[in-house]
Structure formats: structure tokens, C-alpha cells
Amino acid sequence: SWLYNNYFYIIEYYASRYLFYSNITLKPSESKNLLLLSNSTMSTIWPDEHLGYALPILNNFLKPHNIKEILVITYATPCVRIDDGNIQCEGNLILENVSNSFQKLGIKINLLDIEASNINQQSQIKNAEAIYITGGNTFLLKKALYEKGVIDVIKEKIKEGIPIIGVSAGSIIHCPTIKTTNDMPIVCVDSCNVLNSIPFQINAHYNHIENTNGFRMETRDKRLKQYLQNNRTIGSSTNPNFVIGLREGSMIHVSGDKAELAGFNSRPAELLMLNKDGDLIKNQIKIAQELMIYCYYKLLLERSEV
């Protein structure tokens, strides 16, 4: 019948209308230009080379903007005061590798001075032509963004459309909240809200492994199901009703009001959500798939909202 033959297109139509009219759509008025990676290294492809596996995609992402220098923000990496009184930050230990990687693209790095005054740090970000936010601990990163007063500055740079790259924790902070991070809360934060650049949650380094040999820790899927069970409000920008589990070697490219999956993993990502009975449902997302239409198409099917 006509209805059967056109079922997918009908669902896609309603999904696109739902995106357009709800408050969780990517805003077309904002010239977002984000590349959100799950991880920085892939030992199976480019051993020990920071961002090495992603260089072809990074080049395509940055080249149209004629970027000469990129600001590197290492808030997510822990710092300790060593015996001689100096402060040693883990982020500084990878800078040579970061510099070598971007040098291959003809781009210099400029490290954000995390010891400078808040005003000077804000000024560095305001003047950046591109930004790279490294991975580490999401709670450390979130705490620093607010304490340094740079959260609103970064939001403005996102609206300007400058290229912004995030890895792991640096990707999670573009979600509405940090509730789907894998990290321990090694510092206290006053809320879970972050940049809200994208209207859905990411789980970086996604890899569901069932418990074996007496190991009783909760699985990744069980934890993400708990998140979904406690954040089920449809249409809320602070409580997305699905999670994208990004496997290693995968990334999300956000351009304006479009979000697309990219990367080098044969099983790049999983869409995790609850059906109307509260059961966890997973669907594999393919490379080059337009995420928003696909995710809400699947969501509407499972919830029978059409």
C-alpha cells in the first residue's frame, strides 16, 4: 500500500517537524563548527601519535578557515605541586605531541596560560581563531570553565563559528550536561550543566562489556540506562532522551544545524534510548549518518509518538 511504501518518509517528515518545533533542535541561527572526538590516540592505526588517526579529518575541518594558530585548553588535565614548589600539569606533558600533530597541518599551537589571571585567560580565548580542548577529567574541566569565567566566552566563540575541537572530556562539555561522562568526580561541581552546544548526550570511549569472572561492577549500558530512566522529559534541552555512545576512532562533526558521524571505526557509534516500556534499545549509527533526523526517527518509532 502507499502507506507501507512511504512509511520511512512519513516518519522522517514528522521527526524533522519535531526537531524544528521543539526546543532541542540545533539552532540554525548559530554558525556552529565543532569536531567532537571520542579519543586522541588510536594505537591500532597510528601508535602513540596524538590525533594522528584523525589528521585527515582535522585537515578537512580546519583548512577552509585558513587557520594559522590554534589555542589549546588543558583545564581537564590534573596539576600537582612538586617538591621544588613548581606546578606540573599532565596537559603540558602532551604538548610536544599536540604541537607535532598540528604542525603537520601547518598550524602552530598557543597554550592557554592557566596560571594567568581570569581576565587574561578570557582575553586569550576571545582572540583565538580556533580552539582545541583536550581530554582528561570532565569534572576538573567543568569546574575550571566556570571558576575562570570562560564558559560564556567559549559560547560566544561557538556562535561566531570558529573551529572548535574537543576530545573525550573536551567533547562531553558540549553536551547539555556532564551526566554521561565516565570520569570520577575528583572535584565537586555546583551543577552538571555545561555548554549545551548540542541537544543530546555523548558517552565517549563507549564499549559495553558484560560482567565476567565475578566482576560485579555495573556495565556501561546499565549506567546509561539509569541516566535515561532519570532524564525522560521529552523536549527538554537539559534532559535529552537519548545518548550517543562514541566508540574509539569516532567523532561528531557539527556544522550549523547539522550533526554528522565521522571516523574510522567499523562500528562507530550506538544510539541508546528507552522504548515506551522503559527497556534499553540500541541502534548502530553509521559513518556519514545525519544524527538528528536519524535519532529522532528511531525515538519516535520506539515511543510510537507519530
Predicted feature descriptions by range:
Residues E96-K108:
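Short helix-loop-beta junction
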